Amino acid sequence: MPSRKFVEGEVVRGRWPGSSLYYEVEILSHDNKSQLYTVKYKDGTELELKESDIKPLKSFKQRKSGSISSSPSRRRGSRSRSRSRSRSRSPGRAPKGSRRSVSASHEGDVKEKKEKEMRREILQVKLTPLVLKPFGNSVSVYNGEPEHMEKNATPYKDKQERIILSTEDRYIVTQYSLRPRREEVKAKEIESEEQNLVTKGPAPLGTFQVTTPQRKDLEFGGVPGAVLIMLGLPACVLLLLLQCRQKDPGLLHFPPPLPALHELWEPRVCGVYLLWFFVQALFHLLPVGKVAEGTPLVDGRRLQYRLNGLYAFILTSAALGAAVFWGVELCYLYTHFLQLALAATGFSVLLSAYLYVRSLRAPREELSPASSGNAVYDFFIGRELNPRLGAFDLKFFCELRPGLIGWVVINLVMLLMEMKIQERAAPSLAMILVNSFQLLYVVDALWNEEALLTSMDIMHDGFGFMLAFGDLVWVPFTYSLQAFYLVSHPHDLSWPLASVIIALKLCGYVIFRCANSQKNAFRKNPTDPKLAHLKTIHTSTGKSLLVSGWWGFVRHPNYLGDLIMALAWSLPCGFNHLLPYFYIIYFTALLIHREARDEHQCRRKYGLAWEKYCQRVPYRIFPYIY
């Protein structure tokens, strides 16, 4: 392996891409695999340069005229006309000893010509917009990531957000990839793409809009992984529900016998599910609740969201109470639970197909950063980032409304069915704990609905099969598995053991809520005196990473709290079977995978600052374990 010539922190001169100009830069890091140095210019720009494009400071002689600029953002066009030119840069210098005979008007023409040549040289730099993947969520299934322990003091400083053009430069770039200058002449189609990255409007102030590139490094195993997930998840839901209905749901009786096809389909059940979905959509459209703005998109826009999830939950609860009072048979949902899950699955597939077809006509800047250009993968991950019908945001609505509120409704039905089947005058203590724990989780998510706007689901992932199936099928029908299990497999829970489980639940909830609240408070106002005791690491993006408090304990304290709560609402089911613990097993695997995605993205975005953060906070989720 070739030895490195420069070390981190060393100040050197780096060649500006596509030109012969060298500027003062600081070495941030070195990639042994690609043999590229990550450097930072004085204006904050970070590039990857080859070693041949970096020179030590001593190899440059300082000129009195200051012909070598200290920052790539400084242009010679801003110099005073009376300042003498560098000998190497003078376009028309008279022989030594002679007097300049050029008129003032001719001098201006020569200077203007020189400025145009320099601008044309710099504009030939090949530009590759870098889309940094935002992520994090503090509610529901997916919870906050370290990404949102940050606060950007300058709202549009990030390269993926709005970039303001100076009157002097008339152009801007986001992230660059250095190419040999022999390749500056490209095909016409490449040149036309570059023109989209340069703003040349006559207005003194312009806005540069970055288009959303498509990913090349596919997640979830790429296309084969997406196909397996799309086939495997519906089969998994079906097998779980069938197994739970058996008298003995142990592993020795797996797989369960499959019912006849006519038992899996009933048109009336489909009508019930559609009614539920559209009633929740109607609640979402009610003009009540706060209207919040989302994070800036790549073109600088901020979408508006109506935050009335808690109102929808209250209206749903009132409607259910009225239904019970009027004698509506809610047990219908239990007796047709399997058909209801299949109806929701079919609806999610049709919704995913609609979303993909409509995304084919969506502008490029509205596509998801996770999209790839492959039809199968994009159907799975989602091609359009924020599909909307007018002001109705389909992805935001499905994240918390039909599935999460439906989860609570299913739990209530299971509680009523336990009393009916087991001939109880009151629900069992185990059923009460399961319902109470999960109700608290859902209400907390709806109460903090605004935190969803900074989640990976909203900011990064498109709306496709992955989120549609997860929100509409996976959450309500697998997260309610403990209550479904207790209907046919009762478990008598003693009060001392119940007290321990309650304490465990409260411990997990305190960690989960305090970590997310601390993160959200720091993101909104990092100068809050209440947060003055927290230590941070500043990053080159202008944001800071928390390295004390809950976020100095582990990198994902909210994940830790989430997993403790998941264990607490599985324990009331006892230890006779493994089935009630499916959620904690699945959720652990999900959060470990999610943490790995977050780690990869943060390392690319923050570079050396993220390395320092990992040294300060070595444990990812489980302290002293992982």
From Swiss-Prot:
Family annotation (CDD domains): Tudor_LBR (cd20381)
Membrane-side (Nuclear) residue stretches: 1-221
UniProt keyword terms in alphabetical order: Acetylation, Cholesterol biosynthesis, Cholesterol metabolism, Cytoplasm, DNA-binding, Endoplasmic reticulum, Glycoprotein, Lipid biosynthesis, Lipid metabolism, Membrane, Nucleus, Oxidoreductase, Phosphoprotein, Receptor, Steroid biosynthesis, Steroid metabolism, Sterol biosynthesis, Sterol metabolism, Transmembrane, Transmembrane helix
Sites bearing Phosphoserine, chain numbering: S59, S67, S71, S86, S90, S101, S103, S138
EC number: 1.3.1.70
Tissue specificity note: Highly expressed in the testis and lung. Also expressed in the heart, ovary, kidney and liver.
Keyword hit for NAD: no
Transmembrane spans: 222-242, 269-289, 310-330, 337-357, 427-447, 458-478, 492-512, 572-592
Molecular function per GO: chromatin-protein adaptor activity; chromo shadow domain binding; Delta14-sterol reductase activity; DNA binding; NADPH binding
Record carries keyword Membrane: yes
Compositional bias annotation for Basic and acidic residues: 106-117
Role noted for this protein: Catalyzes the reduction of the C14-unsaturated bond of lanosterol, as part of the metabolic pathway leading to cholesterol biosynthesis. Plays a critical role in myeloid cell cholesterol biosynthesis which is essential to both myeloid cell growth and functional maturation. Mediates the activation of NADPH oxidases, perhaps by maintaining critical levels of cholesterol required for membrane lipid raft formation during neutrophil differentiation. Anchors the lamina and the heterochromatin to the inner nuclear membrane.
Subunit: Interacts with CBX5. Interacts with DNA. Interaction with DNA is sequence independent with higher affinity for supercoiled and relaxed circular DNA than linear DNA. Interacts with lamin B. Interacts with CLNK. Interacts with TMEM147; promoting LBR localization to the nucleus inner membrane.
Free-text note regarding domains: The Tudor domain may not recognize methylation marks, but rather bind unassembled free histone H3.
Name of this chain's protein: Delta(14)-sterol reductase LBR
Organism phylogeny: Eukaryota, Metazoa, Chordata, Craniata, Vertebrata
Gene that this polypeptide is encoded by: Lbr
